[in-house]
A protein has these predicted regions:
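Basic, flexible Lys/Arg- and Gly-enriched helix-loop patches that mediate nucleic-acid binding at interfaces
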Residues: 1-196
């Protein structure tokens, strides 16, 4: 789990700009890690890095219903009517259909937005649809994973076994579904598989 800072690309490599993998030590960069989804360059918050394609696919699939919660500061404050519209699902001006989302108004120009999909600039576009453009955006959680205050921007940590178990449960994966790599380790949690 990485606390992505603003100003860093959610990419594995870029010849001109810093990427999220540049924040990791060299030994971790060699493991074939990729970000699960994307956060815009100016967005910060929880970003999961893994080398397991099946896990990534399930986490990002709207069919898995994995909630992603964002804290946003906006120009102006959305209304309860805006929250009701987002709860029904909306179609943006360009025809992009967005699944129902939960909008909680936390105060003047402050909201929590819960999405179950991750389309291009979706959080920003949905809040702009409400007439309240985003001035700051941070992902707080993804499924059962929560970004704690102990992880500062640019820092990372390995998931605990409990977090791994909850994440697998959330997307319907079990250890038997893990892909084996050359070291006979589960790509999701790097522990030897039972009875290889």
């Amino acid at each position: 789990m990485l606390h992505k800072p603003a100003g860093v690309l959610t990419a594995t490599e870029d010849s001109r700009q810093r990427t999220v993998l540049d924040l990791l030590p060299p030994e971790l960069r060699k493991r074939g890690l990729s970000p699960v989804g994307r956060l815009d360059k100016d967005t910060e918050g929880l970003l999961l890095l893994t080398n397991d394609g099946a896990l990534t696919h399930r986490l990002l699939s709207p069919k898995s219903h994995v909630d992603k919660v964002y804290y946003a500061r906006t120009e102006g404050t959305p209304t309860e009517a805006d929250a009701a519209r987002l709860a029904q699902g909306i179609t943006l001006a360009d025809g992009l259909r967005c699944l129902p989302a939960e909008l909680k108004i936390c105060g003047q120009g402050q909201v929590l937005l819960t999405l179950r999909e991750g389309k291009f600039h979706q959080a920003k576009r949905m809040l702009a649809f409400c007439g309240t453009p985003v001035v700051y955006l941070k992902r707080l959680s993804m499924g059962p994973l929560r970004l704690g205050e102990d992880l500062r921007p640019g820092e990372f940590r390995h998931l605990t076994q409990e977090e791994i178990d909850k994440l697998q449960q959330a997307v319907g994966l079990v250890a038997a579904d893990c892909q084996k790599n050359d070291n006979n380790f589960c790509k999701i949690h790097k522990k030897p598989l039972a009875n290889p």
